[in-house]
Each structure stands twice: as structure tokens, then as C-alpha cells.
Amino acid sequence: MTSQLAKKAEAWSARFNEPMSDLVKRYTASVFFDKRLALFDIQGSLAHAAMLAKQGIIAEADRAAIEQGMAQIRQEIEAGTFEWKLDLEDVHLNIEARLTAMAGDAGKRLHTGRSRNDQVATDIRLWLRSEIDNIVGLLRALRGALLDLAEQHTNTIVPGFTHLQVAQPVVFGHHLLAYVEMFTRDTERMLDARKRVNRLPLGAAALAGTSYPIDREFVAQQLGFDGVCRNSLDAVSDRDFAIEFCAAAALVMTHISRFSEELVLWMSPRVGFIDIADRFCTGSSIMPQKKNPDVPELARGKTGRVNGHLIGLLTLMKGQPLAYNKDNQEDKEPLFDTVDTVVDTLRIFADMVPGITVKADAMRAAALQGYATATDLADYLVKRGLPFRDAHEAVAHAVRACDDLRCDLADLSVTQLREISGLGDKANLIGDDVHAVLTLEGSVASRNHIGGTAPEQVRLAIVAARAGLAG
């Protein structure tokens, strides 16, 4: 690393009597992670230069030289030939130094009316806005993949669980639509967070604004911001937008993690509801029979990492006085890693979902266990005039009897159901039509209302979700 330390004075070194040590340079430099902001730094600088020229703060010839130099720097960065220097601390001074080497005094004039404080805040917002747009697109792709799978399984019955115990039958498409709802809310949260990201800090300078006659609204328009940050102190020190994004990202990963947990369970041979395509799984170095769902497992693990970044950013900001502090340099790595993790995870899951093989027979067999239609029997009795609590008790008696007989409610005859219900002279409420409500199909079909698991409602929900996807 020492060989990378150029023997040039820092941009601010005229104030000091001795140079920084190599160790301190390495400790305080950020260029090797914030260089990913480079193209956005160029974008912001070009808009700033255009404003300076428009306002007569720099000459048009200087603006043209800056634009020409930045075009060359962009080419070098995209080609991977740009020489990043640790001695120049960060992405901003590296680009400025290269620009000055090419454009001379014009390059030195670029920083007129701005500080690295408002410059970096602008770069991060430009970058994060772009990444949010990418994430929103990936969320829509995942929602679309889930809808495609749900559409294939509007009649496939699977047990619904509470406490991981069989509760009531649902159609598998309905189960998948629950995740569509989660990822729809995630999309909305991302778009809402984008509103706070899309404000321009540039013009706040170090903390108090600038004495030059700048036009902040012009720069905001050039860069596609909705408006400007209204307080210069807040503009350079605010990282709420990054925290808010990380909170939204943590919820994305939480929903991915919940889905992953179910995929792992469903793929287990003891459950056997699904299979995941080989390209998303790994084997064992010792057990030749293994096919491990590593992608869902890793997604569960990476969720903790993203959650940790959120807590890290909250902790980073909680003790900072106004305005900018060097602490804020530590916002970038957790933010960058959060974006990378969410983007990679969503991209993989959108690719993985279409290849899921659903084992409908296994799902149905599981739904036939655990007395999944017990609630339907209770509802049947209520509809015939029995108070719900009495109906609940009667069905509980029947379930206990089935435990002893090792059979399901649907296996009992009408006579047996009457005898074991404990209803006494009200046992005749159990009629010859009772078995219709004890079937899986009858159970799911009866939930025929908005948000219910009836196949008809699930198909309508898919249509509505697709309309929301297109909107």
C-alpha cells in the first residue's frame, strides 16, 4: 500500500506544518470504496460547471474545458485505466486532480462555490436514486415471477399453517400471493424513500451556503432532482435518506428471508412440497446424496447482514452535532453493501422462482392430515343454529375421537359424527350433507370473498396484482 502514496501535497495541506503519516493516510482515505461514485461525481460536476458559467462565475471557455476534460476522465474510468491515488484521499480529489492536469486553471475553478461536504452528499443521492430505480425494477420482476407461479396453482391445495401446525387448507397460489403483497409494499416503500433521496444538497457548500450568486434550482433541474435541500446545515449532514433506504432494504430482505425459510422447509424430504432447480443448489463434499438449498439459506443469512448495516448507520448518526463530521465517511460501505446484497438477492430469486417444481400430490396429502377442515365443520354447525363456542367444543370432541381412531373427520360416517360430537339432542344438526364441507375443495371454495383463498378470488387477485405491476 505504501507504494501507492504519492508524494504530493493534499488539497488542504497549506495550513499544516507537517504531512500526514502513511498510516493516517490509509486510515482516513476513502477512494478505494467511494470510487464507485465516480460517474455520478462527474455528472454533478458538469451540472455545477454549467451553472457557474450561466451565472458568470466562471468563463464559458472554462466550462468547455471542464466538459472536455470530464469526458476524457469518464472514458478512462469506464475503460479501467484511470489511476486512483490513495494520496488524494477520495473520489472527488482524484477526479479534480486529473481534470486540473488536463484543463489547468479551468479545473481549479470547478470547485468554486462548493465543498466536498455538499459534493459527496449530492453524489450519494444521485447514485442511490439510480440504485433504487434498479431495485424497484427487480422487485417488479420477482412479483411477476411469483404471479406466474401462482397462476399455475389456483387449484393446488396445500395446508395453511399457524405455529407450524396444520390449520386450514389454502390454495398454493393464495400462499404465493401473500409474498406478492409483501414485495408490493416493499416497492411502495422504495418509491417513497426515493422522494427524500431526490433533493439536491449542492449549493450548501461546507455548511453555511456560499457568497457566490449560484442558481441551485438550475442545478437541480439539470440533475433531475425534485427540488433543493432547504437548509444548508441539514443538507450536508443529513443521512436520513440513507437510513430510510436501508430500513426499506431490511424489510425487503426480511420478506426474502421468510420466503427462503419456507423454501428450505418445503424442499426438505420430510415435507417434499417443491424442488428447486439444480443451478441454485449445491452438494456435499462427503455425502453424495445431498442437494442443499444454499441460495435460500444464504439469503436468510445475508438478511442479518443488511439488518446490521441499518443499525450501524443509526448508531453512526445518533451522536453527531451539526454539521458535517468525518464520521459520515463511514456511511458508504454499509450503504454500498446493502445495495449490492439486495440487488444480487432479488436478481437471483427472480430467476429461481420460475424454476420451482411444485409437487401438488404431496401438498394435497399433507392437507389431508391434521384435521385441516375442522373449522369448516364448526362453521357448518354455526350455520345450522349452534353458538360458535358450542360448535367449537363439539368439533374438538370429534377431533379427539379421531385421534383415538386414527382417522380423519372426513372418514367418519354421519352417525359416528353425531355420536362423538357430544351434542346430545342437537346431534341431528349434523346432516347427510356434512361431508361436503369436510372436503379440501369445499373448504377453500367457501372462502369466497376479497382476500380469501377460494380459487375464484385467487384468480381475481392475480389479475389485480398484474394491473398493479404494470402501473
Curated annotation (Swiss-Prot):
It comes from Ralstonia nicotianae (strain ATCC BAA-1114 / GMI1000). Belongs to the lyase 1 family. Argininosuccinate lyase subfamily. Its EC number is 4.3.2.1. The gene is argH. The lineage of its organism: Bacteria, Pseudomonadati, Pseudomonadota, Betaproteobacteria, Burkholderiales. One of its GO terms (biological process) is L-arginine biosynthetic process. Keywords: Amino-acid biosynthesis, Arginine biosynthesis, Cytoplasm, Lyase. It is found in: Cytoplasm. Pathway: Amino-acid biosynthesis; L-arginine biosynthesis; L-arginine from L-ornithine and carbamoyl phosphate: step 3/3. It catalyses: 2-(N(omega)-L-arginino)succinate = fumarate + L-arginine. This is Argininosuccinate lyase.
